[in-house]
């Protein structure tokens, strides 16, 4: 999925709201993308892209990128604790945090199916709204970790996914039942081809809802986001990777603002990424390979495949080998330096002893 498609996905998922003015920086980035893609981003083009995306996204699994932008500034990174946020940015960050349950919810369950968007979207909002009475104060939760070992932003994101999990089964059951009911009342006026297409899509929706009812799928959704957060924290700890990651994230952030310039509270970005392959990679190779994999597919605007996994494994292996060689060369240099110093010290001692011996001999002669 390309940069703009991923950004429109965020828009369709309800990731942003309220108004901000387009900046000169946005316009410059827009012109760069237009030149690179050889097209103009007028409103009709954006609407065409949105319609195209609605036809193609389907049942892709998604993850949330744990970074908060405000304009051109990163106000909360994956590893940011509340007390580390600049004071003038805290109120804005709190507004974004209050949106987190809804942002996460859309990514956890929402699908975009041609001709079925309204009733699925209505169900998504209905189930989410029905549980609003017990939803905790996330800002207070984040604030309470004021100590140096307090809650990082990635911890807060994962906690939101964990708490949303209780709604997934309820949504899945309702989705499956509604799809079954619609199967029973497909219009007889449809042509055989249209009827077949409608039946196939409703069966897919029904099966998707039934999968959401399983403990396995619910656990997979939360686990994939946890791994994504761990991977982003790992990427953030590597300066060169952090720069590449930030540049791509900011590019997508600006694209989303170009798609809908009415955004004001700039929510988190989404990325389509296969949950099962991400989890398998993490379990087989741990966080360094998972981090490299996330970086590669995020920069490449694509989903995980076997080739990207193999590339990540190879990259980490080569990096570790280069680091091992570097450390070994450093160790050898230190040993050589120490041996050289010891040799020099020994010569100095021998020289001093020689001078001392000559002095004593002279005294005896005197």
UniProtKB/Swiss-Prot annotation:
<comment type="similarity">
    <text>Belongs to the UPF0329 family.</text>
</comment>
<feature type="region of interest" description="Disordered">
    <location>
        <begin position="325"/>
        <end position="366"/>
    </location>
</feature>
<dbReference type="InterPro" id="IPR022115">
    <property type="entry name" value="DUF3654"/>
</dbReference>
<dbReference type="Pfam" id="PF12376">
    <property type="entry name" value="DUF3654"/>
</dbReference>
<protein>
    <recommendedName>
        <fullName>UPF0329 protein ECU01_0130/ECU01_1480/ECU08_0060</fullName>
    </recommendedName>
</protein>
């Amino acid at each position: 999925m390309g940069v703009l498609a991923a950004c429109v996905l965020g828009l369709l998922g309800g990731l942003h709201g309220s108004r901000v003015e387009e900046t000169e920086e946005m316009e410059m980035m827009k012109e760069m993308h237009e030149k690179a893609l050889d097209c103009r981003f007028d409103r009709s083009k954006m609407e065409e892209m949105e319609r195209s995306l609605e036809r193609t996204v389907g049942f892709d699994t998604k993850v949330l990128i744990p970074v908060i932008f405000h304009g051109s500034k990163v106000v909360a990174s994956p590893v940011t604790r509340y007390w580390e946020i600049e004071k003038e940015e805290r109120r804005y960050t709190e507004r974004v945090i209050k949106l987190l349950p809804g942002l996460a919810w859309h990514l956890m369950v929402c699908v975009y199916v041609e001709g079925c968007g309204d009733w699925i979207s209505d169900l998504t909002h209905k189930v989410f709204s029905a549980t609003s009475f017990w939803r905790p104060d996330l800002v207070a939760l984040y604030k309470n970790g004021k100590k140096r070992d307090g809650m990082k932003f990635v911890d807060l994101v994962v906690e939101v996914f964990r708490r949303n999990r209780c709604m997934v089964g309820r949504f899945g059951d309702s989705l499956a039942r509604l799809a079954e009911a619609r199967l029973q009342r497909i219009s007889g006026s449809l042509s055989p081809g249209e009827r077949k297409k409608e039946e196939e899509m409703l069966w897919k929706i029904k099966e998707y809802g039934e999968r959401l009812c399983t403990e396995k799928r619910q656990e997979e959704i939360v686990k994939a986001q946890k791994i994504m957060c761990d991977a982003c924290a790992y990427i953030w700890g590597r300066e060169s990777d952090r720069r590449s990651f930030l540049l791509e994230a900011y590019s997508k952030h600006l694209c989303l603002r170009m798609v809908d310039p009415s955004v004001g509270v700039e929510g988190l970005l989404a990325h389509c990424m296969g949950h099962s392959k991400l989890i398998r990679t993490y379990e087989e190779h741990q966080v360094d390979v998972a981090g490299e994999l996330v970086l590669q597919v995020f920069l490449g605007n694509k989903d995980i495949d076997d080739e990207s996994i193999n590339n990540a494994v190879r990259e980490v292996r080569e990096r570790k080998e280069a680091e091992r060689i570097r450390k070994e060369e450093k160790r050898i240099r230190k040993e050589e330096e120490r041996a050289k110093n010891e040799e020099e010290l020994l010569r100095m001692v021998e020289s001093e002893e020689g001078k001392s011996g000559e002095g004593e001999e002279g005294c005896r002669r005197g």
